[in-house]
Regions:
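Metal-dependent de-N-acetylase/amidase catalytic core
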Residues: 1-8, 31, 79, 88, ...
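Active-site rim/loop-helix segments in enzyme catalytic domains that contact anionic ligands
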Residues: 1-109, 139-145
Length: 221
């Protein structure tokens, strides 16, 4: 894993950080690298209410906020920024607002590395809107001053379109930590945790707990 001055993580929902990057972020933190996580929404419209249900539509926002805070504690993230956008509306944010928000984060943290989603291969509209905003904002920075972008892609055609991920972080030592971070997001991850605990877990799911893949984004100019 590379040595970094500061890692800035930008995702739209609580649990995005855990699914994609819990082990990678914990590894950076263990090395003493500052990590800032900007979570754009609180996942107010999350599809699940617990398994069995323990949340309501009214209580879910506050529950997911607490889950986010707990997952960050598990990973070791101490600089959590809750950016205040609303779940499932990120794609409707004016460019000047969301781009300005991201530019302020970059100016404040001066990251050498940004972790976010890869545009076109992130499936959910909020994921795609976040990815697009990160690319637009970083592209405006002079080339020699830009942070590197290592991005998460998980659409079915990602590998076919982008090739194999050029970064595959071995997180074997953080497998149990990643599971604990999943457990922190209890309202959303119950069914997935049951799959992970199954003796019939397949190779893809197992690798999910041992390797975190990323694609480096290259600007045309």
């Amino acid at each position: 894993m590379t040595d970094e001055r500061h890692v800035l993580v930008i995702f739209p929902h609580p649990d995005d950080e855990t699914f994609s990057s819990a082990g990678t972020l914990a590894s950076y933190i263990q090395k003493g690298t500052p990590v800032t996580y900007a979570c754009l929404t609180l996942g107010q419209m999350g599809r699940n209410l617990g398994d069995p249900p323990f949340a309501t539509r009214e209580s879910l926002p506050s529950i997911r906020e607490r889950e986010l805070e707990e997952a960050c504690k598990v990973i070791g993230i101490t600089d959590l920024r809750k950016m205040g956008l609303r779940d499932k509306t990120v794609e409707f944010e004016p460019y000047e607002h969301i781009d300005g928000m991201i530019k302020s984060l970059i100016d404040d943290t001066n990251p050498s590395l940004i972790i976010s989603f890869y545009p076109g291969y992130a499936v959910h509209p909020d994921h795609e809107a976040t990815a697009d905003a990160v690319i637009r904002t970083v592209e405006r920075i002079p080339k020699e001053e830009r942070p590197r972008l290592t991005l998460v892609a998980f659409s079915n055609d990602a590998t076919e379109a982008l090739g194999e991920p050029d970064i595959q972080n071995d997180i074997t030592d953080f497998k149990e930590l990643k599971i604990k971070a999943f457990e922190a997001h209890a309202s959303q991850t119950g069914p997935f945790l049951k799959q992970l605990a199954s003796p019939e877990i397949d190779g893809k799911q197992h690798s999910f707990l041992t390797v975190e893949p990323y694609w480096t984004y290259h600007f045309k100019s």
